[in-house]
């Protein structure tokens, strides 16, 4: 475990990009909670989160004004923290995850109600945008925050490689998946991810399909 200077680029986080993380919190009775939540890097020592009301994570953040962001690529950890709370033996004393490649501690700067027009949930005040300052960064092993756009590119390429081998119904499914993957890549992806998707789109259009 190495405590580093506070610079989120050390774990592959770029300003303006969104990353998939597991946020851990605790309540006043030190009952811990873990939940997969996207984090937007807004500077080398600042992040933004947008969390819907009704979650234990948001309740704990509002009451304690602090939380831990864990960096991991472990699919089991993401699954367990989505489907139910992690067992206590997964946590360190400071509420970080024992298996995390890296983690950073945050203190809340501000809380603001916000709802995007594109949200399926339209009720005002359903979500809270949390602006936070990173107070400590710990790297346990070489780590890079997970950005889901790369997985979307790989899925798109796998589907494209089968495109000429399937019937029209399956082709339409692949096109729908391309559109959804493009939406995600355009929202959270890097320049190279977007270029890759643009190349696939050009090839699909050559086949007279409109992705």
In which residue ranges do the predicted regions lie?
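Basic, polyanion-binding surface patches
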Residues: 1-211
């Amino acid at each position: 475990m190495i405590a580093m200077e506070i610079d989120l680029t050390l774990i592959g986080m770029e300003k303006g990009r969104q990353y998939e993380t597991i946020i851990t919190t605790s309540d006043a009775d030190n009952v811990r909670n873990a939940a997969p939540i996207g984090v937007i890097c807004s500077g080398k020592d600042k992040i933004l989160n947008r969390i819907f009301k009704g979650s234990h994570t948001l309740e704990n953040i509002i009451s304690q004004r602090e939380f831990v962001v864990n960096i991991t690529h472990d699919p089991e950890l993401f699954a367990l923290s989505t489907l139910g709370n992690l067992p206590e033996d997964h946590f360190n004393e400071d509420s970080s995850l024992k298996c995390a490649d890296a983690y950073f501690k945050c203190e809340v700067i501000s809380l603001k109600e916000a709802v995007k027009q594109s949200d399926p949930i339209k009720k005002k005040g359903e979500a809270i945008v949390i602006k936070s300052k990173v107070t400590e960064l710990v790297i346990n092993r070489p780590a890079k925050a997970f950005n889901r756009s790369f997985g979307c590119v790989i899925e798109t390429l796998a589907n494209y490689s089968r495109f000429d081998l399937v019937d029209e119904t399956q082709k339409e499914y692949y096109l729908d998946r391309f559109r959804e993957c493009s939406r995600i890549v355009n929202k959270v992806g890097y320049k190279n991810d977007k270029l890759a998707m643009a190349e696939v789109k050009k090839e699909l259009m050559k086949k007279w399909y409109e992705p």
